[in-house]
Amino acid sequence: MGSIDNLTAQKLTSSQFPMNTLEPEEFRRQGHLMIDFLADYYRKVENYPVRSQVSPGYLREILPESAPYNPESLETILQDVQTKIIPGITHWQSPNFFAYFPSSGSTAGFLGEMLSTGFNVVGFNWMVSPAATELENVVTDWFGKMLQLPKSFLFSGGGGGVLQGTTCEAILCTLVAARDKNLRQHGMDNIGKLVVYCSDQTHSALQKAAKIAGIDPKNFRAIETTKSSNFKLCPKRLESAILYDLQNGLIPLYLCATVGTTSSTTVDPLPALTEVAKKYDLWVHVDAAYAGSACICPEFRQYLDGVENADSFSLNAHKWFLTTLDCCCLWVRDPSALIKSLSTYPEFLKNNASETNKVVDYKDWQIMLSRRFRALKLWFVLRSYGVGQLREFIRGHVGMAKYFEGLVGLDKRFEVVAPRLFSMVCFRIKPSAMIGKNDENEVNEINRKLLESVNDSGRIYVSHTVLGGIYVIRFAIGGTLTDINHVSAAWKVLQDHADALLDDAFLPKKIVNILS
C-alpha cells in the first residue's frame, strides 16, 4: 500500500485538475459577446419570418452525429446559432407575433433571469438560500396587493403566494391539496367518487392535472357553454351537475373558474359560481393565467370580484407581465392544505430553521424538490417599471386591440365572433362574404385556409380556436415591441390574403373593401 507521503510526492500536472469553467474575466468577455448577440437579435427580429419555415427533422440533418471531443469557441457556437438555430425558431418576441397568448419579455425580466441563472442557487427550503425564499414571500405579497386580493391570500393574512413554473403545476398542486383534504374526511377508498367541474372553455391543464391526481376520467365534468352567454360557465348548469352527482353517490370536489379563457378571453361569473361551490363545499380555484395581469388596472379589477370566496388563485406573469418564462404566481388561502399533501422531510433535509416552523420551505408548496430563484426577475420587473408603467403597458395593448376590432368592423366581409374584453380579438370571414357558401363547414374551411395562408407567409403569426362550432381566428396583442403600426400592417396582410382567397366565385361583386 502507498502512503500519504507517496501520494503527495506524486507530480501532478494541471491537466489532472478540473478545468476552470467559471473564470471571472472570461465570463465577462463571453457575457459581453452574448449581450451583443441578443441586442442585435432584437434589433432585427422584425426581419425574420415570425413562424419558423423549416421542415421537421431539419436540425438533425445539419448537426454532427456526435458531440465534439475538443472545445469550440463561443464565437463559433454563436455563428451556428445564427445560421442553424434561429431559422428553426418561431419568434415569440417579434412585434408581428399575434398567436396564442403573449410571452412578453423585457430588459428587466431578462436581467433578473440572468442574475438568477448566474447565482444558480437551489432554493428548496429557507436555509439553503434565505433570500430566495423571503424575496418570493415579498413579491407575491406585493403582487397580491396590486391585484387587491383579499388579505387572506397574503402572508400577512395567513395565506401566501408561491411562484410555480406554469398554470399546469399550480392547478395540479391545488387539486392534489383539495383531493387529500376531502379524502381525509371521506376516506381514502373514495377517490373514485371525486368529481371535478369546469366549463368546456377551461384550459386543458385541468384535465391533465385530474389524470395525474387520480380522478376517474368519467368524473371530469366539462360543462357546455353557449354563444348566448358569451361562453361563460353557467352557475345554474354547475349546480344541476353537482346535484346530479350527489344523487348518484359521487363527491363534488373541485371547481376551476376562469378569468380570461384561452379561446375567447371570456370571464366566468365568479360571485355566482363561488356561491354555488361553497354551498356544496367544493374547493374553488380561479385560473387567470392570461387576463389576471390586466386586473392591476382599476378598470379591470371588477373581473376578480368573487375571488374572496375562492381557495386559490393563479396567473402567469410570463404571459402579459414582462417576466420571462417560467413564472406562474399562485396564491392560496390555506397553505397548510398544500403542505399536508406535498411535504417531504427526509433526514438529509432536516435543519433547525425548518423545525422552528417560522420559515417557509417552498419545496412543500410544489411538486418538485429543487426550485429556481424565480422571484428575482419578478422583483426586477416590479421595481424597474413600477405599478404605474405596468398599468400603461397593459392599457396600451388593450387600446391596440380596440383599434383592431374597429378595423374588422369596417370590413363587411369580416365579423367579430366574441366580445373583446382585453387585448385579443376573435374574428372570421363571415358567410355573407361568399356567394352560395352558407354552410358552416365550408365557411370554417375558408377561414382555416386564410389562417394557413397568412401564417405560411411569415409576415405575421395568428392562431385559431373553435367557438360553438365556428372556426375563429384569434388576434392576441401583447408583444413588448408591438405598436399600432404593426397592428395596422397585420390587418393589411389579413385583408390581402382574404382578397386572394375570396375570388370572384365566392365574393359578391357589390362588396367593396371600403378600406382599400
Swiss-Prot record:
Molecular functions per Gene Ontology: pyridoxal phosphate binding; tyrosine decarboxylase activity
Named cofactor requirement(s): pyridoxal 5'-phosphate
Any one of the GO BP annotations: amino acid metabolic process
Modified residues (N6-(pyridoxal phosphate)lysine): 319
E.C. designation(s): 4.1.1.25
Keywords: Decarboxylase, Lyase, Pyridoxal phosphate
Top EC class, one word: lyase
Family the entry assigns: Belongs to the group II decarboxylase family.
Keyword presence, Glycoprotein: no
Superkingdom classification of source: Eukaryota
GO terms under cellular component: cytoplasm
The keyword Cell wall biogenesis/degradation belongs to this UniProt entry's keyword annotation: no
CDD domains tied to this protein: DOPA_deC_like
Quaternary structure and interacting proteins, as annotated: Homodimer.
SUPFAM superfamilies listed in its UniProt record: PLP-dependent transferases
Catalytic activity: L-tyrosine + H(+) = tyramine + CO2
Name listed for the protein in its UniProt record: Tyrosine decarboxylase 3
